[in-house]
Amino acid sequence: MPCGKPGDYKYGEHTADVLIQAYGCTLEEAFKNAALALADLTYYSSRVEPKESREVAVEYEDLEGLLFRWIDELLYLFDAEKFALSRRIEVKLEKGNGYAIRALLYGEKYDINKHGFTGLIVKAMTYHMMEIKKVEDYWLVQYVVDI
């Protein structure tokens, strides 16, 4: 179902950091687009084929902590395994005593010749300027990463 979201995500300027605003008609879609925005900072996720998969499960007591752990886990997969995300990501968000994300990520080993390099390397996730909120009929997920 279409909604009035302004796009999938956009970047904002921030010295030595990058502000990311990801959008979704659902919170799950916003978290998925937050992951794609992270990937597209370093390489072109549209060039990544969904050859391999990784299961990711993260939990936290609030949505901000959940977002931090989600992005941090994706950074780990790229740094430790050179796992490049394709645009195929299945995200399920659960709410109980806290929040949990169960995701199935598809991608392949990063290859600079195939996936490209934007010139930016994300070093770390931060809590700076983090915001998660519903705006009219869509969700906004905002966060800052160190580059």
UniProtKB/Swiss-Prot annotation:
Q: Where is the secretion signal located?
A: none
Q: List GO BP terms, alphabetically.
A: tRNA splicing, via endonucleolytic cleavage and ligation
Keyword Amino-acid biosynthesis annotated: no
Q: Which domain of life is it from?
A: Archaea
**Binding-site residues for Ca(2+), renumbered to this chain:** 17, 146-147
Q: Which UniProt keywords apply?
A: Calcium, Metal-binding, tRNA processing
Give the matching SUPFAM superfamilies. MTH1598-like (SSF69819)
InterPro entries membership: Archease, Archease_arc, Archease_dom, Archease_dom_sf
Q: Metal-binding: present as a keyword of the record?
A: yes
| GO MF entry, a single one | calcium ion binding
Fetch the Pfam families from UniProt.
Answer: Archease
Q: Tell me, what does this protein do in biology?
A: Activates the tRNA-splicing ligase complex by facilitating the enzymatic turnover of catalytic subunit RtcB. Acts by promoting the guanylylation of RtcB, a key intermediate step in tRNA ligation. Can also alter the NTP specificity of RtcB such that ATP, dGTP or ITP is used efficiently.
Q: Which family does it belong to?
A: Belongs to the archease family.
Write down what this protein is called.
Answer: Protein archease
